[in-house]
């Protein structure tokens, strides 16, 4: 029988807010995904990274802000997104591989990092609903304009 392909979408709150919560929730997701593999499905997984990218961006910004020697700069959002995708994908890949091996299933598991394309003229930017990172004053934001990567502009 040919495997049917399905997409599993793990949403915003699927992983929790802390690393221990994420490890626990990733393990539960891996068990459910392995159940689907046992039912002969080919799985494609997509996931949110909102809370995680926000935590990374906040940490990187605060670290750069507190660095009196100015050895560190603020990481652009595109890199923070890649970092969060990378570590979430890494955790998922390892948990799924472990769960499959524990069940005697020898299938490859891999992670692909994606890029997000944002329309800078999207009207949603006029009324943001979710804060990512530290809230800045107008003066701080204006001073940071020169820090944008071309890919972030």
Question: For the regions a protein language model found, what residue spans apply to each?
Answer:
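Glycine-rich nucleotide/cofactor/substrate-binding loop typically near the N-terminus or early
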Residues: 37, 41-127
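N-terminal glycine-/serine-/threonine-rich phosphate-binding loop
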Residues: 1-46, 56-62
């Amino acid at each position: 029988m040919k495997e049917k392909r399905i997409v599993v979408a793990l949403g915003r709150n699927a992983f929790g807010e802390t690393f221990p919560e994420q490890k626990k929730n990733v393990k539960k997701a891996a068990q459910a995904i392995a159940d689907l593999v046992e039912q002969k499905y080919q799985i494609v997984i997509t996931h949110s990274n909102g809370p995680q990218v926000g935590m990374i961006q906040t940490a990187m910004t605060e670290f750069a802000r507190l660095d009196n020697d100015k050895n560190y700069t603020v990481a652009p959002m595109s890199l923070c997104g890649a970092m969060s995708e990378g570590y979430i994908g890494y955790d998922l890949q390892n948990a799924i591989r472990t769960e499959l091996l524990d069940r005697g299933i020898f299938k490859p598991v891999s992670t692909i990092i994606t890029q997000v394309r944002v329309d800078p003229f999207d009207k949603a930017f006029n009324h943001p609903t979710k804060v990512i990172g530290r809230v800045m004053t107008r003066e701080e934001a204006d001073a940071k304009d020169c820090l944008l990567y071309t890919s972030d502009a």
